[in-house]
């Protein structure tokens, strides 16, 4: 079971993916289903139109913390409930190794449009060519749940904000194991951008709904 965190995040702290899934499902049903009377009849069918909008889940945290694994588990679990899920990895948006701030701003614009029911376009970053790649468009009318995973995710407009944490040494090992030696010279470079981002959006990160510790 989780405990209430008194540290960074001030949200519900847990290491149980099932608790996170339960929270996301309750939020999804709370947004899409109108309040009912004791007979189960809607009290005000015009109160909200959020059923036409996707639930946006932001999964944030420093490199190697376990964001990608959590997003995969949530995608699998929500899909098993019959819910259509789209995962957006911010790694595909950051414009290179110095692009964390710019990528976060791009995601903020995307998420604002989606939350208003408007289509949102972005250009994928081609890491091999170190250049902009193809353009993609997300149509909120065609999505039910969107999971945004990456550093800066909860700086966007999200219905659920999840902050993933792990010890620095473990994060480093995971990152190198995942990306290989090509990441090693960029570790400190990226970490400095993470620190700057967390400082710039400290109030937003303090409002995380859930803190998920992977170790």
Regions found by a protein language model. Give the residues of each.
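Charged, amphipathic alpha-helical linker segments immediately N-terminal to NTP-binding catalytic cores
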Residues: 1-15
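Small-molecule kinase domains that catalyze NTP-dependent phosphoryl transfer to phosphate-bearing small molecules
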Residues: 181-215
């Amino acid at each position: 079971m989780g405990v209430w965190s008194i540290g960074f995040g001030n949200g519900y702290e847990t290491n149980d993916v099932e608790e996170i899934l339960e929270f996301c499902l309750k939020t999804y049903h709370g947004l899409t289903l109108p309040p009912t009377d004791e007979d189960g009849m809607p009290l005000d069918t015009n109160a909200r139109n959020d059923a036409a909008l996707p639930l946006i889940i932001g999964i944030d945290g420093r490199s190697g913390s376990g964001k990608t694994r959590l997003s995969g588990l949530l995608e699998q679990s929500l899909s098993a409930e019959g819910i259509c899920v789209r995962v957006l990895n911010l790694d595909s948006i950051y414009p290179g190794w110095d692009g964390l701030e710019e990528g976060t701003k791009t995601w903020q614009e995307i998420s604002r449009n989606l939350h208003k029911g408007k289509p949102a376009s972005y250009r994928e970053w081609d890491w091999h060519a170190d250049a902009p790649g193809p353009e993609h468009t997300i149509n909120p009318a065609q999505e039910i749940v969107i999971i945004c995973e990456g550093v800066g995710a909860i700086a966007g407009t999200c219905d659920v904000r999840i902050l993933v944490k792990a010890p620095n040494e473990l994060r480093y090992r995971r990152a190198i194991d995942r990306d290989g030696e090509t990441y090693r010279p960029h570790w400190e470079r990226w970490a400095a951008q993470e620190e700057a981002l967390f400082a710039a959006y400290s109030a937003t990160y303090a409002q995380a709904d859930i803190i998920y510790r992977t170790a």
